Amino acid sequence: MAKLTKEEVKHVANLARLAITEEEAEKFAEQLGKITDFAEQLNELDTANVEPTTHVLPLVNVMREDVAVKGLDREVMMLNVREQEDGQVKVPAIM
């Protein structure tokens, strides 16, 4: 598998609207490279006699009635938020 570059990581972070530093981009490129290398090992497995599946469990069309309920009061909810910006909840970037 090709090594992920800092530029690719920064591009994906930008698409996800995450602000990351140069150091984080370098660290994430290395970490994501290790993850893709590990996942690449699956290509070495012989799956010729394995039936393709789309779901692990045989569950089909599990549905419930859609019932609308009143949500939280926005002002009360925002009182419990650790950090906010422009009226939105701000959470740490996780990559």
From Swiss-Prot:
A molecular function (GO) term: glutaminyl-tRNA synthase (glutamine-hydrolyzing) activity
Biological role stated in the UniProt entry: Allows the formation of correctly charged Asn-tRNA(Asn) or Gln-tRNA(Gln) through the transamidation of misacylated Asp-tRNA(Asn) or Glu-tRNA(Gln) in organisms which lack either or both of asparaginyl-tRNA or glutaminyl-tRNA synthetases. The reaction takes place in the presence of glutamine and ATP through an activated phospho-Asp-tRNA(Asn) or phospho-Glu-tRNA(Gln).
GO BP: glutaminyl-tRNAGln biosynthesis via transamidation; regulation of translational fidelity; translation
Species annotation: Lysinibacillus sphaericus (strain C3-41)
Subunit description: Heterotrimer of A, B and C subunits.
Protein family (similarity comment): Belongs to the GatC family.
Protein name: Aspartyl/glutamyl-tRNA(Asn/Gln) amidotransferase subunit C
Xref: NCBIfam families: gatC
EC number: 6.3.5.-
Known catalytic reactions: L-glutamyl-tRNA(Gln) + L-glutamine + ATP + H2O = L-glutaminyl-tRNA(Gln) + L-glutamate + ADP + phosphate + H(+); L-aspartyl-tRNA(Asn) + L-glutamine + ATP + H2O = L-asparaginyl-tRNA(Asn) + L-glutamate + ADP + phosphate + 2 H(+)
Pfam families: GatC
Encoding gene per record: gatC
Keywords carried by this UniProt record: ATP-binding, Ligase, Nucleotide-binding, Protein biosynthesis
Database matches in InterPro entries: Asp/Glu-ADT_sf_sub_c (IPR036113), GatC (IPR003837)
